[in-house]
Amino acid sequence: MLWFASCWDEESVDFIESFAPPCYKVASASLTDIPLLKKMRATGRPLMLSTGMSTMEEIAAAVDAIGRENLLIAHATSSYPCPPEHLNLNMIRTLKAQYPECVIGYSGHEVGLAPTWAAVTLGAAFVERHITLDRAMWGSDQAASVEIGGLLRLVASIRDIERSMGDGVKRIYEGELAARKKLRRVVSAPALPTN
């Protein structure tokens, strides 16, 4: 299993770098800490930038500071748990349009799984959810976390969504042929007189 970390200061980057992580996560709270972002970028590893509690201008400043190469951007709203009306999932489309060369994903802090599934349908290439053994445990983000059973359902349904999206080309599938033969109706009209 691969793992990576969010570093909250430059010294932590030095420490985590000794473990050769596959990438670094920039926590939403650190998006405006440009020296920290540059320190992570200097490792040469991919960066995942979370965008909670940020303006488009702050996101642009962070991206300008670290460049778009090997950059993943996660739409996020930093409320724990986040009410549905604050999720603003259409930001995924906005980020995809603004940063077409970056991989755009979703970092969810909501209760339930449906918004994360919707994010995938809207084009999120990756998702992040907090995981817990028990949502009733003490802690600021436990209620917005997913228990193990929920994680299994989340992943299985995402795989179903990926298979369901198709390529956008209309076709008749083999499974439709019998129904087509049995149910298809042909409408005809009598020949109209010609003048």
Regions found by a protein language model. Give the residues of each.
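Catalytic cores and adjacent flexible loops of soluble metabolic enzymes
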Residues: 1-194
